[in-house]
Amino acid sequence: YYGPLSLLALFVVWAVGLIFAFTILQYAAGSAINLAPNQKPGFWSDLYMSGTTFFTLGLGDVTPRSEVARIITVFEAGLGFGFLALVISYLPVLYGSFSRREVNISLLDARAGSPPSASEMLRRVALRQNPHAFEQNLNEWEKWSAELMESHLSYPVLCYFRSQHNNQSWLAALTTVLDVSALLIAYGQGELKWQAKLTFAISRHALVDLSQVLNTPPREFEEERLPPNELQELRALLIAAELSTCCPDEDQRLAELRRMYEPYARALSDRLLMPIGKWAPEAKVVDNWRTSAWARISSADVQPAPLTELEEREHF
């Protein structure tokens, strides 16, 4: 809840700061306000005057008495209207950007698992589509990365907004896209390799720029995300999908590409508390669309039948 609560707290800080600023101006102008009989003007009456003016309450129990006080009051009332209009227009823009971001992240559950991984995306998408269809898929993620960079650089608070499921996040999705693109650049061929380069470029651009905005220097992973045995499995997937011949000489190229983005992903993961998975999924991970909280709550004594090994590994 840090993202939404911090945004609300920011609005409160802005409003309180402006009210106190105009309070000080009224106090410096001599507290020239009309009060009820037997009441003396002072700092607290100026604060009340400033609050009612900023939120345009118009109660009429306190009014400015001098020309300077009237000018300050009019200016504060206009600024209060502008502040409310800014808040009203700001929230829908934030929600629209958040909603567009989450659409593709939700689609990843069926396409790359939850949490997403490069090997699952290759197994589920690349093995079941022709190279042209997979190229279109990468093109969609290129556009998503560009929109992510534009919206999150303009509104950095969106970086703290969580996805609907705790095993999904925009950072994990972006890292998965970079993993797949790096694989195709290192081992791929033809037009698909060119599209992978374009997707990798904008995705890394977004990752690095957001790291700079959030002041998170790159950090190396303490644990290897891609052990040699998993790399061998990925090469086998690429060959099975007819996307590459996977020459082992390209392993160095993949390592160079990984060094271009993994340290930034690690830094953002630590800063935002958003875990990043490995290149291959953890064993016995079930997609979100196959689970239900109601089943776990309503059947305390009845355990669901275990999935067969084929059902665990197959998408549908």
Where are the model-predicted features located?
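Cytosolic juxtamembrane amphipathic/interface segments immediately preceding
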Residues: 1-7, 61
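Pore domain of cation channels
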Residues: 11-14, 22-23, 36-103, 179
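C-terminal TM-helix exit segments that contain a strictly Trp-centered aromatic cap at the helix terminus
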Residues: 20-31
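Generic, well-ordered alpha-helical scaffold segments in large soluble proteins
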Residues: 81, 94, 144-147, 180, ...
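Membrane-proximal helical linkers
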Residues: 95-128, 136
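Soluble C-terminal extramembrane regulatory/interaction domains of multi-pass membrane proteins
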Residues: 112, 116, 130, 137-140, ...
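Acidic, Ser/Thr-rich low-complexity segments on the non-lumenal side of membrane proteins
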Residues: 119-152, 162
